[in-house]
Amino acid sequence: MSRIGKMPIPLSNQAKIEIKDSNIRVSGPKGTLEQRLTDQVTVSEENGLVTVLRIDDSKKAKAQHGLYRMLISNMVDGVTKGFTRKLEIAGVGYRAELKNDLLALTLGYSHMIYFKAPDEIKIEVPDQVTVLVSGIDKALVGQVAAKIRSFRKPEPYRGKGIKYEGEVIRRKEGKAAGK
């Protein structure tokens, strides 16, 4: 049995879960998330614990078991606590600002880059070199953060670009001086 899949998911007092046929809905103080389940797993809730069981030991069912357990766990965490991804901008003249729900990025190009986030995602700019992406859907928060990072990925020679908080950029030496 999957090590991740067999662990029960504890429900907090704030989260409520509804299981109907092949759909699961988790609601909490921050919002509501829905997920369609595959026919390879079954979900049950009792005594504040959600358990995910697979229907057989086929390869596909084993693969889906841990996946759906983590998806449901992330849904519970999202509607109660939420998720945040912090991006750091490094480089001379590189900065970010918020203009009318648009993230305006100056990243060394000849033009500014404007990014409109989905409605479910909240973007904050506490200072010019920090961008906070937050929301209740972990996958969507990560996807939006990756999209913002893709506008100017960190480069290994000077370390300029947009990187995740705590991300380590392997630095390269560059060209050696003439001999």
UniProtKB/Swiss-Prot annotation:
What is any one of the record's Gene Ontology cellular component terms? cytosolic large ribosomal subunit
From the Swiss-Prot or TrEMBL record, give the protein name.
Answer: Large ribosomal subunit protein uL6
Top-rank taxon: Bacteria
Q: Which family does it belong to?
A: Belongs to the universal ribosomal protein uL6 family.
Q: Which cysteine pairs are covalently linked by disulfides here?
A: none
Described purpose of this protein according to its UniProt entry: This protein binds to the 23S rRNA, and is important in its secondary structure. It is located near the subunit interface in the base of the L7/L12 stalk, and near the tRNA binding site of the peptidyltransferase center.
Instruction: Name any one GO molecular function.
Output: rRNA binding
Q: Which Pfam families match?
A: Ribosomal_L6 (PF00347)
Share what the entry says about its subunit structure, partners included. Part of the 50S ribosomal subunit.
InterPro entries xref list: Ribosomal_uL6-like, Ribosomal_uL6-like_a/b-dom_sf, Ribosomal_uL6_a/b-dom, Ribosomal_uL6_bac-type
Q: Which organism is it from?
A: Pelodictyon phaeoclathratiforme (strain DSM 5477 / BU-1)
Q: Name one GO biological process term.
A: cytoplasmic translation
Task: Provide this UniProt record's keywords sorted from A to Z.
Answer: Ribonucleoprotein, Ribosomal protein, RNA-binding, rRNA-binding
